């Protein structure tokens, strides 16, 4: 599982199976890289896609893999959690906008399946209040500025102010920040004490430049 003393780069993949395989082979080996099977990728390829990503990254990274299945669960996630865990995922996501009962069940299901629970707080105005309502705390909270928000609402900033508040109350929680795509934004993310920075657009738009992009972002994950 993840080390609280480390910073991580999470790369989300949403291209075709063949393209994702090619891009993963271009990644530099690193224990700081997390591979995400993005929601569109999972919808297209299902658990076969997840197990394939696990295999490709394992071959490239000497078996050292951490795979996130971006399920975005909103209701009754038990079956989905079990399926992705069996396929080799190390973590799965549930939306913070889901009912509290659903989030509680999701966290329990992940614990029983032996994988990390990640709660995605996209479009949640007060993430801390969601956490206060839960029976148990997730392993990871994702503070998320969505893709459409990035494109259509440039005034929407990354919710970095939430990081220290959450960490101040929950010592064992990890914070992931999604929605910052430039090296400057990723640097700010880590400066504000996030544990994980999620990127995808640069890799999606420039798959042939995967190696250089990963190396540049990894320099920030110190």
Where on the chain are the PLM-derived regions?
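C-terminal helical cap(s) of enzyme catalytic domains, especially alpha/beta-barrels
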Residues: 106, 110, 191, 200-222
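Short, acidic/polar
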Residues: 16-27, 75-83, 125-131, 182-187
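Glycine-enriched alpha-helix->loop->beta-strand junction motifs that scaffold or abut catalytic
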Residues: 29-33, 56-64, 86-91, 111-116, ...
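Conserved anion-binding
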Residues: 2-9, 76-170
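Conserved N-terminal beta1-alpha1 strand-loop-helix module at the mouth
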Residues: 1-78, 136, 211-216
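Generic structural signal for hydrophobic
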Residues: 23-27, 53, 84, 110, ...
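Active-site/ligand-binding-proximal alpha/beta "capping" segment
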Residues: 139-203, 211
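Hydrophobic faces of well-ordered beta-strands that scaffold small-molecule active sites
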Residues: 7-13, 33-37, 67-71, 92-94, ...
